[in-house]
C-alpha cells in the first residue's frame, strides 16, 4: 500500500489542529495530495436531535445557516495558515493543483453541503488514509457521526489523532509503533494497511492481550513476526495479561507504557467501537493514552 491521497476531516476547531498539522506532514513525507474536507450539515441532519417540528422553524434554520457560515470561514482560515506554514500549494474546486510533475505535496480545501455520514463515506473511499481528531465534544453530534462513518463506511484506515492544538510543525515522525494483534480479520487488515508506517519505524512491538485462563498462541505470533520480516520490519512480540481490564484497555495502557508514537488496531463491532471512541470507560482510557490510533474495520 502506498499513500498518495489523504483525507482530513476538519470542522474548524482548535482541538483539531493537531490532526490538520499531521495531515500536512503526512503529505510532505509521502509526496501526497491532502484534501481537507469541511462539511456543512443541512438542517435535516439535526432532525434526530431537535425533532422535525423544531427544525422546520425559520428561526432554527437561520441559526444553523449562521453557524455553518462561521464554521466554514474559521476552517478556511486555519487551512490557509497551515498550508503556508508547511509551504504546501493550496487549491480548491476552482483551482485544482496537480502534483504529477513536481512530485511534491499539494493540498485542496473541499467544502460540501449535505448529510455528513454520506459525504464522509463517499469522499473517504477516494483516499488512501483518513485523518481525524478524536475526543472533540460536539453538542450536535455531527462530528461524532463523521468519525463513525470514516471508520465503518469507507474501508480505509483511519488515523485518529488526540485532540489538541498543534505545538510545532515537523515532518511526520512515527518511530515507535505498537501493533495490536488478535488473529482476526480486522487486525490483519490493520496490519497490512499500516505497512507504510511500520517500514519507517525504528521500533515495532506486536502486542497480544490475553484474558484470564486464555492460552497464548506463540506459533501464530511467530507467524506474524515472520510476515513482517518479509517486508523488512523487525518486531518484538509482547504478551499482555488483561486481568480485570478489557483487551482494548490493556493494549492502550501498555502502548502508553512503551511510549508508542502510534497504536495500530482493528476496529471490531460497530456498537463496541462506538463506545470506545465516543463515551464510557474505554473512552477515558483513550483520553489517558493520548497517542494516535490507526484503525481499520
Q: Predicted segments — roles?
A:
Residues 138-139, 167, 212-216, 242-245, ...:
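Short, small-residue-enriched loops and turns at beta-alpha junctions
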Amino acid at each position: 500500500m502506498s499513500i498518495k491521497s489523504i483525507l482530513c476531516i476538519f470542522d474548524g476547531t482548535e482541538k483539531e489542529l493537531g490532526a490538520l498539522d499531521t495531515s500536512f506532514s503526512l503529505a510532505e513525507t509521502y509526496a501526497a495530495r491532502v484534501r481537507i474536507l469541511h462539511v456543512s450539515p443541512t438542517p435535516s441532519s439535526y432532525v434526530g436531535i431537535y425533532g422535525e417540528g423544531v427544525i422546520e422553524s425559520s428561526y432554527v434554520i437561520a441559526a444553523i445557516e449562521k453557524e455553518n457560515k462561521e464554521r466554514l470561514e474559521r476552517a478556511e482560515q486555519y487551512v490557509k495558515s497551515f498550508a503556508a506554514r508547511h509551504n504546501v500549494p493550496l487549491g480548491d474546486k476552482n483551482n485544482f493543483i496537480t502534483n504529477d510533475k513536481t512530485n511534491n505535496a499539494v493540498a485542496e480545501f473541499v467544502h460540501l453541503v449535505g448529510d455528513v455520514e454520506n459525504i464522509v463515506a463517499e469522499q473517504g473511499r477516494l483516499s488512501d488514509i483518513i485523518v481525524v481528531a478524536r475526543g472533540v465534544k460536539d453538542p450536535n453530534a455531527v462530528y461524532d457521526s463523521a468519525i463513525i462513518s470514516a471508520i465503518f463506511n469507507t474501508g480505509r484506515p483511519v488515523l485518529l489523532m488526540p485532540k489538541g492544538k498543534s505545538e510545532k510543525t515537523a515532518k511526520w515522525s512515527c518511530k515507535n509503533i505498537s501493533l495490536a494483534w488478535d488473529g482476526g480479520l480486522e487486525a490483519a487488515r490493520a496490519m497490512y494497511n499500516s505497512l507504510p508506517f511500520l517500514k519507517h519505524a525504528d521500533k515495532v512491538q506486536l502486542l497480544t492481550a490475553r484474558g484470564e485462563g486464555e492460552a497464548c498462541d506463540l506459533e501464530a505470533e511467530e507467524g506474524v513476526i515472520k510476515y513482517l520480516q518479509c517486508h523488512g520490519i523487525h518486531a518484538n512480540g509482547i504478551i499482555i495479561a488483561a486481568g480485570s481490564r478489557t483487551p482494548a484497555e490493556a493494549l492502550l495502557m501498555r502502548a502508553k507504557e512503551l511510549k508508542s508514537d502510534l497504536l495500530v488496531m482493528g476496529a471490531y463491532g460497530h456498537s463496541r467501537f462506538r463506545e470506545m471512541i465516543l463515551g464510557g470507560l474505554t473512552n477515558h482510557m483513550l483520553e489517558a493514552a493520548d497517542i494516535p490510533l490507526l484503525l481499520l474495520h
